[in-house]
Design a protein with these regions (language model features):
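Solvent-exposed, extracytoplasmic
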Residues: 107-124, 153-155, 159, 193, ...
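Extreme N-terminal signal-anchor transmembrane helix of membrane signaling/transducer proteins, especially
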Residues: 1-14, 18, 23-62
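Short, intrinsically disordered, charge-balanced linker/junction segments flanking boundaries
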Residues: 253-256, 260-265, 269-278
Length: 278
């Protein structure tokens, strides 16, 4: 009888143990499920936040790039206009001097005074020169160039003598070794006879009004300006050593040479990512 009771008690204890085990299992399952749900909720929240942050970053980046491109394009257009006005004013100064010299072309003092006045009056030119129809220098400023009486055979001089009209030369190396552009105006007497020309030079690697105009700008974000001619040659660059260099493989330069204007992001010839306006 006693063994029977013990047996029953043992069975009851085993049954209770199984019930407790089942309950604990259910509790563990519930806990694991809650952890899983919590983990998923946190994961979704984090992913949603990161996605929103990335989307916001991309939108702001695109807006910033778009605004930067517009600013660069507007600034480039403004500089082009200012440069055109400078060159027009320089040509007008030379035209006025040509009228004066046409009357007194044989007066050496007048030639010397006019070249000096033209160079010093506005600082438009780094040097000025009067050349006769044979290419011989009659007067120049500054006198330190020591060109008087010399026959000029530079590309700019040959162009001016051949064209016999107002012109702006292509860049070339001058007789004294400077990389220059010459703005010239022909001199004709009252009978229409060609006497020669008066020219003003812009030294591309030295200071002057044009150089200062291009060098000084108000963007302090690492932006810079460069100017090219139709032969892809750099006429202005903040790295003076690159002035005169021909640049190939730059899509912005190619677009400019096709007469286009606009904006774009590109990798330049130095493998630097740029936002360019042109």
């Amino acid at each position: 009888m006693l063994s029977f009771i013990v047996s029953i008690i043992a069975k009851e204890i085993q049954g209770q143990h199984r019930e407790v085990s089942i309950l604990l299992g259910r509790v563990n399952i519930n806990l694991d499920l809650k952890k899983l749900i919590l983990f998923l909720a946190i994961s979704v929240t984090v992913i949603t936040f990161l996605n929103g942050f990335y989307s916001s970053y991309q939108v702001q980046k695109q807006q910033l790039q778009s605004q930067t491109l517009k600013n660069h394009n507007a600034y480039a257009a403004k500089l082009v206009s200012a440069t055109d006005r400078f060159l027009l004013a320089a040509q007008q100064q030379l035209a006025y001097s040509a009228k004066i010299l046409a009357i007194q072309f044989n007066d050496a003092n007048t030639l010397a005074q006019e070249t000096q006045r033209l160079r010093l009056q506005t600082d438009s030119f780094n040097s000025t020169v009067v050349v006769d129809k044979n290419g011989v220098v009659l007067a120049h400023s500054p006198l330190s160039l020591k060109l008087k009486g010399q026959l000029l055979e530079s590309d700019g001089a040959k162009q001016a003598l051949a064209n016999k009209k107002p012109m702006i030369s292509e860049p070339y190396i001058s007789a004294v070794g400077n990389l220059v552009i010459v703005i010239s105006h022909p001199i004709f007497n009252s009978q229409g006879e060609y006497l020669g020309y008066i020219g003003g030079t812009l030294y591309l690697k030295q200071k002057g009004i044009l150089h200062d105009l291009l060098q000084v700008h108000f963007h302090k974000d690492g932006s810079y300006i460069y100017v090219i001619d139709k032969n892809r040659r750099l006429l202005y660059h903040p790295d003076v050593a690159r002035i005169g260099e021909q640049v190939f493989g730059n899509p912005v330069i190619e677009a400019v040479l096709r007469g286009e204007s606009g904006t774009r992001q590109l990798i330049n010839s130095q493998n630097i990512v740029m936002l360019a306006g042109y």
